[in-house]
């Protein structure tokens, strides 16, 4: 064995001494000179052997415990995996909480020249439709926000629809009842017009009856007058016939008496002429002589009559006259006769006037009934027109109320739409503020 320092082939004395000492100790141990060391070495060997056995047992026990711990760990890990899979199936949001845009917004840098901010990518949901709206893959953030706003608007629309259903039902019932109200008003107007027409027909019938009565009365009067005239003509013809039969017997007697009467008339005429001629002269002389006497007598008579009238009065004059009772009775007879004639004339006039008044009353009632019938028909027609106009006015009133309610609903919808739009804008503003705060927190 050579030295590593000098490189010579001579042996090292120190190493040779150590080797010699070691060999000597080994020889002493074999020969029994150093018994203490041998005893100690035997005890140490036994202790080492016992410790080695204990170490082997402990190692085997530890390996068994490790296996049991490994199996229990495997079971617990399997239970945790099944529990995690159940939670992921029951709630997508909990399973994908670590994959949201906020979690992916901030990531560590992948290289020296790469920033630590990446655009977020939203997870793909399991369902492809939400309330009938199809979700597409690869949609951007703004598109998804618009979709969210659309879904919010649809939800608000459903709530508005639920709140407006009662109002719409009331409006529909009002619209349906408007024609019924109009028809009821028309029926009422038609009934009133029918009643007016019935009254008009009654008046018309009354007028026709009065006209017929007037015609019958006039015809009866004409018939009675014609009948009286016919009876008078018959009596006149009967008297003529009787007179003709009597004249046939007295014709000869009349002829003989006529000739004798002519002769007597001629004789008496001649005699009267002579007598008149003789008496004419005497009458003239007598008239001239008695003229003065008559004038004086007349004056005296007038004076006496005036005195008697002044003294006795009308009754005295009547009583002083001769035959005054005959004159009075004659005057009373004249008064009675003339009064009877006047009364008869007045009765005839009154009867005629009453008959004429009855006829005129019948005639006027007939004319009035006819005119009332015509007027009633016109009134019924106008009542129908008035009922139709009133029905149309009521229908228009109902429809105006409906239009007012619909306008109110439109105003409410507009207000709620503006509120929803403002809410969506506020949501976008909050999202933008959140992104700004996240970016500022990243770079600061």
UniProtKB/Swiss-Prot annotation:
Residues 15-24, 88-103 have a biased composition (Low complexity). It holds the Pfam family SseC. Belongs to the chlamydial CPn_0808/CT_579/TC_0868 family. Residues 1-124 are annotated as: Disordered. It comes from the Bacteria. This is Protein CPn_0808/CP_1063/CPj0808/CpB0837. Coiled coil: none annotated. InterPro entries: BipB-like_C (IPR006972). Residues 1-13, 25-42, 113-124 have a biased composition (Polar residues). Residues 77-86 have a biased composition (Basic and acidic residues). Transmembrane segments: none annotated.
């Amino acid at each position: 064995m050579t030295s590593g320092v000098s490189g010579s082939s001579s042996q090292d004395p120190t190493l040779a001494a150590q080797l010699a000492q070691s060999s000597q100790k080994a020889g002493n141990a074999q020969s029994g000179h150093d018994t203490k060391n041998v005893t100690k070495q035997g005890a140490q060997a036994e202790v080492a052997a016992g410790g080695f056995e204990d170490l082997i047992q402990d190692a085997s026990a530890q390996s068994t415990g490790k296996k049991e711990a490994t199996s229990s760990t495997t079971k617990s890990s399997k239970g945790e995996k099944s529990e995690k899979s159940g939670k992921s199936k029951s709630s997508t949001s909990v399973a994908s909480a670590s994959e949201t845009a906020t979690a992916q917004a901030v990531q560590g840098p992948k290289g020296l020249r790469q920033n630590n901010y990446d655009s977020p990518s939203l997870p793909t949901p399991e369902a492809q439709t939400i309330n009938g709206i199809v979700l597409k893959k690869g949609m951007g953030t703004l598109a998804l926000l618009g979709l969210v706003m659309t879904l919010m608007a649809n939800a608000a629309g459903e709530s508005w629809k639920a709140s407006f259903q009662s109002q719409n039902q009331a409006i529909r019932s009002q619209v349906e009842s408007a024609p019924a109200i109009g028809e009821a008003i028309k029926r009422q107007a038609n009934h009133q017009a029918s009643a007016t027409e019935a009254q008009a027909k009654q008046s018309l019938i009354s007028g026709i009856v009065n006209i017929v009565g007037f015609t019958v009365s006039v015809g009866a009067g004409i018939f009675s007058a014609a009948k009286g005239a016919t009876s008078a003509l018959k009596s006149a013809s009967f008297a003529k016939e009787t007179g003709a039969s009597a004249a046939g017997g007295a014709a000869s007697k009349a002829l003989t008496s006529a000739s004798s009467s002519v002769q007597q008339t001629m004789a008496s005429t001649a005699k009267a002429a002579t007598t008149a001629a003789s008496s004419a002269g005497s009458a003239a002389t007598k008239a001239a002589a008695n003229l003065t006497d008559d004038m004086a007598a007349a004056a005296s008579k007038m004076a006496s009559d005036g005195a008697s009238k002044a003294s006795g009065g009308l009754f005295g004059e009547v009583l002083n006259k001769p035959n005054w009772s005959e004159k009075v009775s004659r005057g009373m007879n004249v008064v009675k006769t003339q009064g009877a004639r006047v009364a008869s004339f007045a009765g005839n006039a009154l009867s005629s006037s009453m008959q004429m008044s009855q006829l005129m009353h019948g005639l006027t009632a007939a004319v009035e009934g006819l005119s009332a019938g015509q007027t009633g028909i016109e009134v019924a027609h106008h009542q129908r027109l008035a009922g139709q106009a009133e029905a149309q006015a009521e229908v228009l009133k109902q429809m105006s109320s409906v239009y007012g309610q619909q306008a109110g609903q439109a105003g409410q919808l507009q207000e709620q739409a503006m509120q929803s739009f403002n809410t969506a804008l506020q949501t976008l503003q909050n999202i933008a503020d959140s992104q700004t705060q996240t970016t500022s927190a990243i770079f600061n």
